[in-house]
């Protein structure tokens, strides 16, 4: 049993792909009696989200430098030094037993500050291709963890999967209900929606509905509701379509769906595996190092997903893939089972166990 009173500083921010896996680990350790504190930046999503889960958060002043202008790049070294000193002050005051970095701007300075203070540093990389921060920090980290095989080529890393919510793991273990006559398509393009899905789905559904009964739950993103609703109506498809700017209850959405049309973010791929759902993946084409394509290959190679590059995606290709799945419900069920077969269901516990072990040694 983990001794109570241990302290962990969690560094994760910027996107849900970093923050939500970190929250899963933080909640697990807090339930074991650990004191959790967060390090992030004040202008990103962690500033709003982390306090809602009851964790204290400290901020440092740091921004990314990839792709920025010359003046900003020249000033970057001085800002990095300042942010390391800010992180060092947080560490000196909190005195963590271990520091966990899970991506985002704050992880870089925080990771360096942890090692300067002689505190064990655990890194977790969610994507199949490591981000710049984790790539650099991996050289000095005490332990490197990753979600997918062959993520790191220059350091030894342990594959542990991506921590996800226990509710989704439990959902995947439940028996699948008998399929309805209508194919139920969940469309998720992230919190901002995906323009390509918003543009293509109304017409694709119109084509599909000529041969097959279909219902759609479509997350369109902020400020896109009216336009997408009008597009479905224009194609005569507003009756079987549920349109939302944002889906708050993804557990309910996954439970409802037969197939998911989505991007291939690391957390999305891990959730699809955990809940055992087949998918049509369209990787975000501007993702750094095209990491979403590599993420999606995990499900594609398992026979659990189709991957359609956005550059070649059109209405007919999308409608064709949906028709293929609608026509063969047995294969659809097999794809869902293959997704579940590649899921790593104890990722949260594995990440926590590494932190616990290092804290006890220290």
From Swiss-Prot:
InterPro entries: GlcNAc_MurG, Glyco_trans_28_C, GlycoTrans_28_N. Its EC number is 2.4.1.227. Pathway: Cell wall biogenesis; peptidoglycan biosynthesis. UDP-N-acetyl-alpha-D-glucosamine binds at residues 15-17, 127, 165, 191, 247, 266-271, 292. Its main location: membrane. Gene3D superfamilies: Glycogen Phosphorylase B. It is found in: Cell inner membrane. Signal peptide: none annotated. Keywords: Cell cycle, Cell division, Cell inner membrane, Cell membrane, Cell shape, Cell wall biogenesis/degradation, Glycosyltransferase, Membrane, Peptidoglycan synthesis, Transferase. It is a peripheral membrane protein. GO terms for biological process: carbohydrate metabolic process; cell division; cell wall organization; lipid glycosylation; peptidoglycan biosynthetic process; regulation of cell shape. The keyword Cell division applies. It comes from the Bacteria. It catalyses: di-trans,octa-cis-undecaprenyl diphospho-N-acetyl-alpha-D-muramoyl-L-alanyl-D-glutamyl-meso-2,6-diaminopimeloyl-D-alanyl-D-alanine + UDP-N-acetyl-alpha-D-glucosamine = di-trans,octa-cis-undecaprenyl diphospho-[N-acetyl-alpha-D-glucosaminyl-(1->4)]-N-acetyl-alpha-D-muramoyl-L-alanyl-D-glutamyl-meso-2,6-diaminopimeloyl-D-alanyl-D-alanine + UDP + H(+). GO terms for molecular function: UDP-N-acetyl-D-glucosamine:N-acetylmuramoyl-L-alanyl-D-glutamyl-meso-2,6-diaminopimelyl-D-alanyl-D-alanine-diphosphoundecaprenol 4-beta-N-acetylglucosaminlytransferase activity; undecaprenyldiphospho-muramoylpentapeptide beta-N-acetylglucosaminyltransferase activity. GO terms for cellular component: plasma membrane. Belongs to the glycosyltransferase 28 family. MurG subfamily. Cell wall formation. Catalyzes the transfer of a GlcNAc subunit on undecaprenyl-pyrophosphoryl-MurNAc-pentapeptide (lipid intermediate I) to form undecaprenyl-pyrophosphoryl-MurNAc-(pentapeptide)GlcNAc (lipid intermediate II). PANTHER family: GLYCOSYLTRANSFERASE, UDP-N-ACETYLGLUCOSAMINE--N-ACETYLMURAMYL-(PENTAPEPTIDE) PYROPHOSPHORYL-UNDECAPRENOL N-ACETYLGLUCOSAMINE TRANSFERASE 1. NCBIfam families: murG. This is UDP-N-acetylglucosamine--N-acetylmuramyl-(pentapeptide) pyrophosphoryl-undecaprenol N-acetylglucosamine transferase. It comes from Shewanella baltica (strain OS185).
């Amino acid at each position: 049993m983990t001794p109570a009173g241990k302290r962990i500083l969690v560094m994760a921010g910027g996107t849900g792909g970093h923050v939500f896996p970190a929250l899963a680990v933080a909640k697990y350790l807090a339930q074991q009696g650990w004191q959790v504190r967060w390090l992030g930046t004040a202008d990103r999503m962690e500033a709003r989200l982390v306090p809602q889960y009851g964790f204290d958060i400290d901020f440092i002043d740091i921004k990314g430098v990839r792709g920025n202008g010359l003046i900003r790049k020249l000033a970057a070294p001085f800002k990095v030094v300042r942010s390391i000193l800010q992180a060092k002050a947080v560490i000196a005051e909190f005195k963590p037993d271990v520091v966990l970095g899970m991506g985002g701007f704050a992880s870089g300075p925080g990771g360096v500050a942890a090692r300067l203070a002689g505190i064990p540093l655990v890194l977790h990389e969610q994507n199949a291709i490591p981000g710049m921060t984790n790539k650099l920090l991996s050289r000095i980290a005490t332990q490197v963890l990753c979600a997918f095989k062959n993520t790191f080529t220059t350091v030894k890393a342990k594959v542990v999967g991506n921590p996800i919510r226990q509710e989704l793991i439990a959902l995947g273990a439940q028996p699948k209900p008998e399929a309805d006559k209508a194919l139920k398509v969940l469309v998720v393009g992230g919190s901002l929606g995906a323009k390509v899905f918003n543009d293509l789905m109304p017409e694709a559904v119109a084509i599909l509905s000529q041969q097959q009964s279909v219902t759609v739950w479509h997350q369109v993103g902020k400020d896109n509701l009216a336009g997408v609703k009008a597009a479905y109506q224009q194609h005569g498809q507003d009756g079987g379509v549920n349109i939302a700017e944002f889906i708050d209850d993804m557990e309910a959405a996954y439970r409802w769906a037969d197939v998911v049309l989505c991007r291939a973010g690391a957390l999305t791929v891990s959730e699809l595996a955990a809940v055992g759902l087949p998918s049509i993946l369209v990787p975000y084409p501007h993702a750094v190092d095209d990491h979403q394509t590599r993420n999606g290959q995990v499900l594609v190679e398992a026979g659990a997903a189709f991957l359609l590059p956005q550059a070649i995606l059109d209405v007919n290709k999308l409608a064709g893939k949906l028709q293929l799945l609608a026509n063969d419900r047995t294969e659809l069920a097999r794809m869902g089972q293959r997704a579940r077969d590649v899921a790593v269901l104890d990722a949260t516990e594995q990440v926590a166990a590494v932190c616990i072990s290092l804290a006890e040694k220290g």
